[in-house]
Amino acid sequence: MYPNFYIATYENYVEENVIKSKKIKVVIHVGKRKKFIGKEKLEEIRVPIEFNEDDYDLLQINLDLYNYMHDTIEYIHEHLKNNRSVLLLGYGYKQEVDVMVCSFYMRYGKVPPKLAMYYLKTKKKNVFLPECLYEYCLEKYYEEEIDKE
């Protein structure tokens, strides 16, 4: 993706030894339930959003994620420009991490949502399947944060 910017799932980051091998300094947990890793010298924050397939309002979950987008993307960018490795950590079967990555592409690559999603699909298997649940969020972020520049 970008130098020093990584994504992993809660299901595989320990086995792949991502934090040590990539010299991660910042972890952004995308989800409500998992505990912080708690290692010394590791900065951790949480984006407390989680799609619940049993009981959800799709528009509301899009708006909830959108409310975290600007600050999270700026936070990632600040650390990357200071050469600090960042890990976005989430659930493999959820789409929130992928939406954050697309938002970063949109913001700093100046590309529209469809192109950002296409680019991510060329780098990662099984993304946005069967469909993207957060297109509204991506479109809103693009219109309000990027297209206005």
What annotation goes with each model-predicted range?
Residues 97-99:
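A eukaryotic "domain-to-IDR transition" signal
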